[in-house]
Amino acid sequence: MVGCDKGMAADVLGRIADPVTVFGEASVSDVIAELGRGSRVLLLLRHSERPKIGYEDKTFGASLPLTENGKHLCVEFGRMLAGATPSVEFRASPLLRTVMTAELVAEGMGLAGAEVVRDALIGNGSAYVASELEVWRLFRDGSFFQRMGEYMQAGEQRGFNPLASATDAFEEHALSVFSAQLGVFATHDVYVAAFLHARGVKTDFNPDNWPRFLDSAAIVLRPDGERRYMLVRAGLSPLACGVA
């Protein structure tokens, strides 16, 4: 963690009655503006570009690295945030591509070597997942977008926990470990999309508007106690899926 204040996390959890605003889509410039006005911003960041994951891979590509372009995009994303605040912390789902994403974003921010905490609870061990094996079976036939659409619209899906309660638990955990002004928590598109849908930020996700690589769900904690939710479009990649 860089420049963190460990008293901040408890303060966030204590504000359970904060007014909430659903802001919609935003850019990295909007994130920087929020930091400039004293807000704290937690980015639930989709990892950068990776190769395609085979349908028979029960690990969901745990050992897949980022592509060379994906590495470059991470550094570019970090440069966009560089200097916005001296108080930054990094956390990642334990899969290789998410850890690499956080490390390379830190490098782009001028914070190479910053600690990246591995945290399964923002990855495939999160509150959203009831059974990793069942989720793999669900997506095995290539029907990822269809099955995710069903989950978000119905609030239930095989292999997943109920959307509403899972989102609450996911957010509670993320905020409980967030203690800097800016958090960069590298995770996966499944959880970014599910979170944004459940919070009412975007309820019409489909393959054309799916979170792209390095897009994120942002939780903004303003100094006056207001909590905002945003879909932050990085604008660095047109891709929703891995490359061949």
Give the positions of each predicted feature.
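Low-complexity, serine/threonine/proline-enriched polar segments
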Residues: 115-116, 120-158
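Short, solvent-exposed aromatic-acidic interface loops
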Residues: 231-241
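Short aromatic-enriched loop/helix-cap "lid" or pocket-rim segments at secondary-structure transitions
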Residues: 54-58, 103, 127-133, 197-198
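Short helix/loop capping segments that flank catalytic or ligand/cofactor-binding pockets
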Residues: 53, 121, 194-195
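Histidine-centered active-site/metal-ligand motif
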Residues: 47, 188, 237
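Active-site-adjacent alpha-helix immediately C-terminal to a catalytic or transition-state-stabilizing loop
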Residues: 35, 165-229
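Active-site-proximal alpha-helix that buttresses catalytic centers in soluble enzyme cores
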Residues: 2-118, 149, 154-160, 204-222
